[in-house]
């Protein structure tokens, strides 16, 4: 009879357990391969970007090997670049390749030919950005960089800094010799400690009176009057104001 040919319950349970174990093992193996494929894909893209940027004079710093990355996969390209500098590489203008460097924490483009910084808006890990002595005039894309702590725009032709009000973690802002007139938007930067406004046409610094975190302010060669500077100093007794 058919009933006598059926495997005992213990055997059936063992078979079910073995099948479940096999299925779980296959799923885990697939996940591992997917992760390794993603790492390999990112490494390949970064390898191309780095080769291109190195040919233009860039220098790099890479992260330490992540704990999850096997030793045999550890190469310069499998680790994310955390710092890139192209300082005074006058021919460098196109920042689009940098969008592939998602682990980037610091970027120095001072003295380059960069004009458009919109491709940098997706660099969510970026903490420091130097754009001094560039032709960058539109900084609105930088409002997306929520982790940014340092921003240097010395002598860049910037006029509108209202978008920077979204940078809640910003601690250092250099607007020396820019075309900025209105700094009222900066009143939203509650963590700002250093602000450089020298050699600008800024005349009204009253909005900065709410920045209790501010410790250093430069207003040399501005339109700020002695009376305004005095009032600001009274509102911010712990801030060193230089004019």
Which residue stretches match the model-derived regions?
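Hydrophobic membrane-insertion alpha-helices, especially the h-region
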Residues: 22-37
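Alpha-helical transmembrane signal-anchor/signal-peptide segments
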Residues: 42-58
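LRR N-terminal entry segment and analogous cap-like coil->beta motifs
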Residues: 55-132, 149
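Leucine-rich repeat
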Residues: 78, 98-104, 120-126, 142-148, ...
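Conserved hydrophobic beta-strand positions in leucine-rich repeat
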Residues: 82-86, 107-109, 127-131, 149-153, ...
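Conserved "Asn-ladder"/turn position within leucine-rich repeats
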Residues: 89-90, 112, 134, 156, ...
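Per-repeat structural element of leucine-rich repeats
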Residues: 93-94, 115-119, 137-141, 159-163, ...
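Leucine-rich solenoid repeat scaffolds
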Residues: 207-243
């Amino acid at each position: 009879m058919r009933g006598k040919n059926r495997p005992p319950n213990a055997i059936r349970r063992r078979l079910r357990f073995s099948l479940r174990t096999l299925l779980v093992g296959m799923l885990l193996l697939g996940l591992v391969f997917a992760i390794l494929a993603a790492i390999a894909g990112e490494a390949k893209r970064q390898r191309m970007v780095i080769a291109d940027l190195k040919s233009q004079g860039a220098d790099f710093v890479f992260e330490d090997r992540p704990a999850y990355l096997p030793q045999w996969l550890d190469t310069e390209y499998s680790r994310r670049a955390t710092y890139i500098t192209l300082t005074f590489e006058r021919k460098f203008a196109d920042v689009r390749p940098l969008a592939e460097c998602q682990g980037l924490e610091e970027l120095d483009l001072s003295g380059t030919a960069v004009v458009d910084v919109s491709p940098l808006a997706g660099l969510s890990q970026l903490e420091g950005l130097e754009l001094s002595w560039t032709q960058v005039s539109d900084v609105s894309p930088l409002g997306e960089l929520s982790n940014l702590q340092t921003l240097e725009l010395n002598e860049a032709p910037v006029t509108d800094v209202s978008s920077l009000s979204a940078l809640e973690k910003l601690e250092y802002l250099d607007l020396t010799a820019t075309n900025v007139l209105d700094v009222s938007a900066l009143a939203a930067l509650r963590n700002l400690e250093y602000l450089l406004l020298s050699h600008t046409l800024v005349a009204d610094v009253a909005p900065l009176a709410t920045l209790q975190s501010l410790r250093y302010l430069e207003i040399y060669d501005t339109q700020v009057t002695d009376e305004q500077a005095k009032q600001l100093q009274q509102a911010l007794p712990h801030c060193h104001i230089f004019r």
